[in-house]
Amino acid sequence: MKSFFIFLWSFFFFLFIGCDKNDSPTAILANLEGQWVLDRVVCFCYFGEAGTENFDDQQLWFSKDQLYPMGPNNDMPNIAPIGKVYDYSISGEILTINQSGKKYTLEISGDTLSLTFVDNEMIADNEISFYFKKGTADPSCIDFSAVIEDGICTMEYAPVCGCNGLSYSNKCMAQSAGVMSWENGECE
């Protein structure tokens, strides 16, 4: 009888308390895919006069198993050097960039993604958190397989505005970045 009571209690516990279907790895991946635009960075670092930082041109794109940091230069913060596609894995709340082994605590709340570097406690002041807002670009805007790292393009200036909201100096630069469509002229 005692075994039956324990079984019954366990059944109702998991039935009513159990796992939230939105916390499953599949749900996290579905919410993660697409464009994320860097909103703010919290760290012991300097980006100019406080309150004047603008990270709008720093983006992070996710597909099922790859991520792609985008932006005009590597001087601004992002979770990995821009212009390269990285494989990643998620275990629980930890996102790992496979090529570098860097780990970030991942949290999605509504249209906000936060990635906090899992720091080495023996190194002072290496804590950094990135906060991204969900972008509006269609996920098909970027083709990860079309990215040409260190692509060679002419330096002609014939600007185009990519479907991701970033300006490129010419069509070749947009194509090398994996951008699938664009309009002539700079983004506004």
Describe each PLM feature range.
Residues M1-K2, D20:
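N-terminal hydrophobic targeting signals that begin at the initiator methionine
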Residues D20-G83, S89-C141:
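Lipid interaction determinants
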Residues D138-E188:
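Extracellular/cell-surface secretome signature
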Residues K2-S10:
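Sec-dependent signal peptide recognition
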Residues L15-G18:
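C-terminal motif of bacterial Sec signal peptides marking the signal peptidase cleavage site
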